[in-house]
Amino acid sequence: MKSGFGEGAYFITRSVYRDQFREKLGFDPFPGTLNIEVGDPEIVERIREGAPVIQGGGGFGDVLYVKALLNGVVEGAILFPLKTHHRQGCLEFVAPVNLRKTLKLRDGDTVSLDIDTSEIQE
């Protein structure tokens, strides 16, 4: 995992997304994302394909999402903003808690994700 641009908190708190996060993800995300580097960008694309959509609006882009479990402990979701500055091999994970504090994570730490494929369309 690595530090991001600090933009996640801004977008997570926008009302255009917040109500949909509560409805579709089942939680109110902590303002910020955990950026997870994935060695193979093709893995990211495979996860992203068929992911459900959270609608943007008012100049904000749509966001695809897939529910996941981080380190076997924290339920959350991987977000795929259609407008992003991240390179392809980076996943943005959100959860209802501050993940760095809750799991005592630092830049460079390795994390695991269990992907919930039940909402992914083929």
From Swiss-Prot:
UniProt xrefs under InterPro entries: RibK_CTP-dep, Riboflavin_kinase_archaeal, Riboflavin_kinase_CTP-dep, Riboflavin_kinase_dom_sf
Binding residues for FMN: 84, 92
Pathway where it operates: Cofactor biosynthesis; FMN biosynthesis; FMN from riboflavin (CTP route): step 1/1
Catalytic activity as recorded in UniProt: riboflavin + CTP = CDP + FMN + H(+)
A single GO BP: riboflavin biosynthetic process
Enzyme class label: transferase
Cofactor-binding details, from the entry: Binds 1 Mg(2+) ion per subunit.
Cofactor: Mg(2+)
SUPFAM superfamilies: Riboflavin kinase-like (SSF82114)
EC annotation from Swiss-Prot or TrEMBL: 2.7.1.161
A Pfam entry, by short name: CTP-dep_RFKase
GO molecular function term, any single one: magnesium ion binding
Key words of the record: Flavoprotein, FMN, Kinase, Magnesium, Metal-binding, Nucleotide-binding, Transferase
Binding annotation for Mg(2+): 33, 35
Residues where CDP binds: 4-9, 97-100
Record-linked PANTHER family: RIBOFLAVIN KINASE (PTHR40706:SF1)
Family: Belongs to the archaeal riboflavin kinase family.
Protein role: Catalyzes the CTP-dependent phosphorylation of riboflavin (vitamin B2) to form flavin mononucleotide (FMN).
Protein name (Swiss-Prot/TrEMBL): Riboflavin kinase
Lineage of origin: Archaea, Methanobacteriati, Methanobacteriota, Methanomada group, Methanobacteria
